[in-house]
Curated annotation (Swiss-Prot):
Identification of the protein by name: Glycine cleavage system H protein
Pfam families recorded: GCV_H
One GO term (biological process): glycine decarboxylation via glycine cleavage system
Cofactor: (R)-lipoate
Note on cofactor: Binds 1 lipoyl cofactor covalently.
Modified residues (N6-lipoyllysine): 65
Annotated source species: Pectobacterium atrosepticum (strain SCRI 1043 / ATCC BAA-672)
Domain Lipoyl-binding: 24-106
Key words, A-Z: Lipoyl
Amino acid sequence: MSNVPTELKYATSHEWVLHEGDGIYSVGITEHAQELLGDMVFIDLPEVGTVVAAGDDCAVAESVKAASDIYAPISGEVVEVNEDLENSPELVNSAPYTDGWLFRIKISDESDLDELLDAEGYQASLEEDE
């Protein structure tokens, strides 16, 4: 049973978002996603300044098992990337909801948040997949 923090919003494609204030949202992949992928070896992050639309593939997580696209859960501009992942991609495995965040987006359309799931909805979607 994966850990699903209640303060986050989730995409069905297993990304999470956390409001950091001032329209800035941190984005990462869920504990469930990192469990499926296995040990991370490289994370290809978007460049700061990249404008993404909700649903766009914007990063790649490479693990010992596979390379998997990561999708933008909300639209906006990438304003920061987690540079610690360059030398320590395993943070995505060990701390997917904290130190293993991927990038931050300045949201351009708040209504994108309405399309995301709360923790209960995401947990239910995981149980349907089992």
